[in-house]
Amino acid sequence: MRNWELSVSPSFLELCDQYVSLCESPSFSGPSCLNDMAPDDILGNCDLFAEAADALFPDCLLEEVEAASGLAFETNEEVEGFVFPDCPERPGQECRSCKQHREMSGDPSILCSLCYMRLTACFVYSPVSDVEDEEPTEGVAENSLKRQADSSLCSSSPKRFC
């Protein structure tokens, strides 16, 4: 086996040292605030490129692309089919979201999540442990929903959740 030895001339090493010293960033002695970093006439500099940008991308071209891609707000099928939640005075009555859920499921007593939350609880969270003086509930009875909805604490605060 032969061993090869590469010898580098000192002038090459000096050039490398000079290059590294040029590439190193100098110590920071920056401006006192962010506004001093940008030139005052930055808007004037942007105006120089405005005509070129308009020539490259005219408004009529952008409108054609938007119409062809179906990204326009009016033609977006996902937005048209979406029912935005209501916040009726009486949860479950005259609520578009509840109506949509009832039509889709065929169950006339079903509620949307917002109306269900407003009927069954005053707050979004649930307690960590059960209250000892309440009777255990295996299922949610209809009269307990009405009783909770008629309580003074819940009836004074449903507007907070809308």
UniProtKB/Swiss-Prot annotation:
One of the GO biological process terms: symbiont-mediated perturbation of host process
InterPro entries noted in UniProt: Aden_E1A
Domain of life, source organism: Viruses
A matching Pfam family: Adeno_E1A
Keywords for this protein: Early protein
Residues passing through the membrane, by range: none
Disordered as annotated region, ranges: 134-162
Polar residues bias (residue ranges): 150-162
Descriptive protein name: Early E1A 18 kDa protein
